[in-house]
Swiss-Prot record:
Belongs to the class I-like SAM-binding methyltransferase superfamily. TrmB family. S-adenosyl-L-methionine binds at E44, D69, D96, D118. Pathway: tRNA modification; N(7)-methylguanine-tRNA biosynthesis. NCBIfam families: PRK00121.2-2, tRNA (guanosine(46)-N7)-methyltransferase TrmB. GO terms for cellular component: tRNA methyltransferase complex. InterPro entries: SAM-dependent_MTases_sf, tRNA_(Gua-N-7)_MeTrfase_Trmb, tRNA_methyltr_TrmB_bact. The active site is at D118. This is tRNA (guanine-N(7)-)-methyltransferase. It is an enzyme of class 2 (transferase). Its EC number is 2.1.1.33.
Length: 211
């Protein structure tokens, strides 16, 4: 989600260390200490303006959430939502999420969310897709045995590609939704993109895949 640079974004992030982890490399293997409890840790890669991660944190107070985004302006808007929600079970990371092993120990997180990731439709960009096998290698490391990836997209091509990628990797598909919003799935929290696409009548796809 590309947005214009927000004036004061850096200062806003730095002024809220209770939510924004300013030294993420030092947090590796210490996340439960940072949260102050042993609750499960769920991570969203590419959290955008934070509607999903803040909504999930409010909906599930006994789960710790971490939202990751590389764009500081976007993350500052996510921080706005966190502050508005008044939740304490959330942290934000202003980092490139291409190698999460820089920030998480093996098996340190319990679930990973990939919501509306860049589909990188051209074949030559296949390795950039977050459901490509090298990313799955990384995700498998930081998740526990039988750890799960929950994936949503509006892009049919990326959805089909990801189903194949998960299956070829040996993952178990615990749930596949071909039209999430027309299903009986309960507890869905929408991202900004999801709300936008849904308002246009676009189908939303969802997968729960287990290592």
């Amino acid at each position: 989600m590309r947005v214009r640079n927000r004036k004061g974004a850096t200062e806003l992030l730095e002024a809220n260390p209770q939510y924004v982890v300013l030294n993420p490399l030092e947090a590796k293997a210490k996340w439960r200490d940072l949260f102050g409890n042993d609750n499960p840790i769920h991570v969203e890669v590419g959290s955008g303006k934070g509607a999903f991660v803040s909504g999930m944190a409010k909906q599930n107070p006994d789960i710790n959430y971490i939202g990751i985004d590389i764009q500081k302006s976007v993350l500052s808007y996510a921080l706005d939502k966190v502050l508005e929600a008044g939740v304490s079970n959330i942290k934000l990371l202003w980092v490139d999420g291409s190698d999460l092993t820089d920030y998480f120990e093996d098996g340190e997180i319990d679930r990973l969310y990939l919501n509306f990731s860049d589909p990188w439709p051209k074949k030559r960009h296949e390795k950039r897709r977050l459901t490509y096998k090298t990313f799955l290698d990384t995700f498998k490391r930081i998740l526990p045995e039988n750890g799960e990836i929950h994936f949503k997209t509006d892009n049919r091509g990326l959805f089909e590609y990801s189903l194949v990628s998960f299956s070829q990797y040996g993952m178990k598909l615990n749930g596949v939704w071909l039209d999430l919003h027309a299903s009986d799935f309960e507890g869905n929290v929408m991202t900004e993109y999801e709300q936008k696409f849904s308002n246009k009548g676009q189908v939303i796809y969802r997968v729960e895949a287990e290592f």
